[in-house]
Amino acid sequence: MCGIFGYIGAKLAVPVVLDGLAKLEYRGYDSAGLAAVIPERLFVRKTVGRVDELRSSLEKENVPSSLAIGHTRWATHGVPTVKNAHPHVDENSACAIVHNGIIDNFKELRSLLISEGISFSSDTDSEVIAQLFAFRYQATGDLVHSFSWTLSQLQGSFSCGLIHKDHPNVLLCAAQESPLIIGLGEKESFIASDARAFLKHTKSIQALASGELAVVGLGSEVETYNFALKRIHKEVRQVVYTDADSDKQGYSYYMLKEIYEQPEVLERLIHKYLDQQGCISEKFLNGFSIEDFDEISIVACGSSYHAGFLAKYIIESLVSIPVHVEVASEFRYRQAYIGKKTLAILISQSGETADTLAALKEFRRRQVACVLGICNVEESALATGVDHCLFLEAGIEIGVASTKAFTAQLLLLILLGLKLATLKQTLSLEEHRACGKGLFELPELCNRLLANENLHSWANDYCDEDRFIFLGRRLMYPICMEAALKLKEIAYVEANCYPAGEMKHGPIALISQGSPVITFCGDPVVYEKMVGCIMEVKARQAHVIAVASESQEDIAAVSDAQIYVPNSHPLVSPILYTIVGQIMAYTMALKKGYEIDRPRNLAKSVTVE
């Protein structure tokens, strides 16, 4: 949830670290800080708020250092204050650490250190790392062995960086079930939670695997070990992103830019995985066999869970294989039945979602037939830990509320359904080609939808509302769930979603005169049922905003306002309706004057429980 950055090289370290932290703010922005080694001591500066606050506090400082670490925080242990901000130092200010993750046994370690006479200055779990390392280092005088020993005492998921005032040429770092990437430049090196933070300097990286530490020296010298200090050889690879991918490119917000990038992202995946006849290409999950499993278990969090929920409807209708969808944070503690012939599908934009990675461990423990990952980051823990991985290829997504990554997930899951139908021969060639034709048309339909002025202006009439009800059925229900989540995330509106058929079982009691109800009517199989539900809430004087296909103009007779979506193949329509929900949330947040890219209390990558 936090962002770590470190630099060692010939440049002045502080400006490099500040720039790197600015690229990591999507991971947390409660507070920020940095520490640098200057002659015979550490320089430490911390502020509450965003990286710009930290930068402003350093404008008049001259920090002659070539080694520094920095941190931008999303609070888990301890409220956002200067004392709880990172970096944390030991009681003698000899070493400084930055940390992302949670130390599960910090209370025991803290009590042990206090019994040794060591004083703590913060409420965080992270300070334990600095104090424990200093305690060991004082006894042994060995920097690397003390670091290794400290790591062996920690329980939990974490990544960290450490510097010491007496070692101005060494940057230590480690990862345990939390991402940390090393960047290798010309006589300089970087560490970061995300490689995007140092792309302006280098595209050569090494990703630390769980249970690995690195000793980074001047001149791009990197030695990698496991926590027991057994040397590990790691290959250097090149990342494909460019620093320009992180720019807004003329848009007011990253979220808006990423909404408008969706047609291109979808078109790229469609042309990669469909042949000219509209059939699924052999390159899609090449070597994948359906004979190994008889059920599917999908596990994810947040928006990715909604994508998995839609996949359940699609796959079960195309292939007649039972599909179970679980929230990862519940799955890991539920003691669910998991058969040996299960295909496990784990979905995570970042590939670092803590609960989803815990589910991966559980599936491995249960020895399921196959584990498939769907994510956007090739060097992520999810991508490297599964049997097969489908990459979103959505490019960098910086807006905290997922847009293009989510629709790419939907597309890959639709393609997965078609792949399974091909392998099981449950779809005729004509039906398959009709689906393919619908997919080929999708990017242009997205562009048409994005040009709909009625959609962009809807918030003008509803920006004073503080509660919405979303209703959908079948394929539209998971998409309504996602639309409601988007309104919560960035417009801070209480938006509740229900299957339309459940209204009479309780939620209809919430309806009073003028209650805004948004209905997604795009599934033709249940269109008449949706009309019936609209009439039910209208009878209770609700104000109904109907989102429907262009061919469903009769919806105007039973609703108060309408947003029309281009006609499309039923399998494709959920993606178009998703974009409607994104624009609704964006325009509402814009009208209310909220910070769209960095909504309160949220972070892009949820790397802790």
UniProtKB/Swiss-Prot annotation:
EC identifiers of the protein: 2.6.1.16
GO terms (BP aspect): carbohydrate metabolic process; fructose 6-phosphate metabolic process; protein N-linked glycosylation; UDP-N-acetylglucosamine metabolic process
Molecular functions per Gene Ontology: carbohydrate derivative binding; glutamine-fructose-6-phosphate transaminase (isomerizing) activity
Primary localization: cytoplasm
Stored InterPro entries: GATase_2_dom (IPR017932), GFAT (IPR005855), GFAT_N (IPR047084), GlmS/AgaS_SIS (IPR035466), GlmS/FrlB_SIS (IPR035490), Ntn_hydrolases_N (IPR029055), SIS_dom (IPR001347), SIS_dom_sf (IPR046348)
Xref: SUPFAM superfamilies: N-terminal nucleophile aminohydrolases (Ntn hydrolases), SIS domain
Cellular localisation: Cytoplasm
One GO CC annotation: cytosol
Active-site residue numbers: C2 (nucleophile), K604 (for fru-6p isomerization activity)
Entry keywords, A to Z: Aminotransferase, Cytoplasm, Glutamine amidotransferase, Repeat, Transferase
Residue ranges occupied by any Glutamine amidotransferase type-2 domain in the UniProt entry: 2-219
Record's catalysed reaction(s): D-fructose 6-phosphate + L-glutamine = D-glucosamine 6-phosphate + L-glutamate
Protein name: Glutamine--fructose-6-phosphate aminotransferase [isomerizing]
Species this chain originates from: Chlamydia caviae (strain ATCC VR-813 / DSM 19441 / 03DC25 / GPIC)
Gene giving rise to this polypeptide: glmS
